[in-house]
Regions:
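Outer membrane beta-barrel transmembrane domains
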Residues: 41-47, 52, 99, 103, ...
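Structural signature of outer-membrane beta-barrel domains
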Residues: 47-49, 78-82, 118-122, 169-175, ...
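Cleavable N-terminal export/targeting peptides
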Residues: 1-36
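Outer-membrane beta-barrel translocator domains and adjoining extracellular loop/strand segments
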Residues: 52-58, 75, 81-92, 123-132, ...
């Protein structure tokens, strides 16, 4: 048995994550006559920032499995959301992002990587509604990310697995701030934030039910980033979202922890739920809640 731990535990994005980081269990454990090499996953949820509103998001991903390897393409949309409590200079933005990921297993060691590209639409109307000021801003922004992770699966009996991991990400994101002008108007100034983030953590998964189709999991990680605003949280288990408050970032260290659940409705369909929260983040603490459904064929 190879319980595909990351596929269940990373269920959400992201961002993205944003639902799986390895091949679905159904595709690898199914008999040869019922092998399922393709899967489609749709997710939605919201990242809630303490005191500064929330950011809804949705994603659709298509995965092709090749034995112990996979390739995945995911499209993600992150809404600008509400910005209650954000600085008046903040110009909210929505993000559309495509992520290409791939991974493979060599024995118990899993290697996963991704590259993401996106564009950001700055919402001048939302800024005007919140501040009562008009703003001149002609440009839109962009986002880019790339990362690599190593995971080692340690079986704990026949129905549980512990998976320590280490990961590194590079992210670049555009933000915009308002500069006050005479006469009650403002001008938008675009800038780019970029940074490197490292994470070290572990996940644990318990499988149960008929054919071990159901699961519950726990996740915890310590992260350090050279820029906590650039970190785009493409991996779904990470609660930080694109552009924390759309403000310039700083170097930061924090912890993330969460829980997941998956309900296998059949060999081809499962429902997924994930809740992840930050602790010790210099910006507003974030809680990410995600629900999704997966189909394999």
């Amino acid at each position: 048995m190879r319980p595909i731990f990351i596929a269940r535990l990373a269920a959400t994005i992201a961002i993205s994550a944003v639902i799986a980081a390895a091949a679905p269990a159904a595709a690898q454990d199914a008999p040869a006559t019922d092998k399922r090499d393709w899967s489609i996953t749709a997710t939605g949820g919201s990242t809630i920032f303490a005191g500064t509103g929330d950011q809804p998001f949705a994603s659709v991903g298509v995965t092709r499995n090749f034995g112990d390897s996979y390739v995945r393409l995911t499209g993600t949309y992150v809404d600008g959301g509400s910005d209650d409590g954000a600085p008046l200079s903040t110009i909210p933005a929505s993000t559309r992002q495509m992520t290409l990921g791939a991974g493979t297993y060599v024995g118990a060691l899993g290697v996963d990587g991704y590259v993401s590209l996106g564009d950001r639409r700055f919402d001048r109307r939302a800024f005007t509604t919140r501040t009562g000021q008009t703003i001149a801003l002609d440009s839109n922004g962009a986002s880019f990310g790339a990362g690599l992770s190593l995971t080692y699966e340690i079986p704990l009996g026949d129905s549980a697995v512990l998976a320590p991991f280490v990961a590194g990400d590079y992210s670049r994101i555009s933000i915009a701030r308002a500069l006050a002008l005479p006469g009650g108007t403002s001008m938008g100034e675009e800038s780019r934030e970029d940074g490197i983030t490292g994470s070290l953590g572990a996940s644990a998964l318990w499988l149960f039910g008929p054919d071990q189709r159901h699961s519950v999991g726990l996740y915890a990680a310590a992260l350090t980033s050279s820029n906590n605003s650039a970190y785009n949280g493409t991996n779904a288990t990470r609660a930080t979202a694109l552009g924390i408050g759309d403000q310039p970032g700083v170097s930061d260290e924090w912890i993330e922890y969460g829980a997941t659940a998956a309900l296998g409705l059949s060999a081809a369909v499962d429902l997924q739920l994930a809740v992840v929260r930050t602790a010790g983040f210099l910006g507003p603490e974030a809680t990410s809640v995600t629900a999704g459904v997966g189909f394999s064929f």
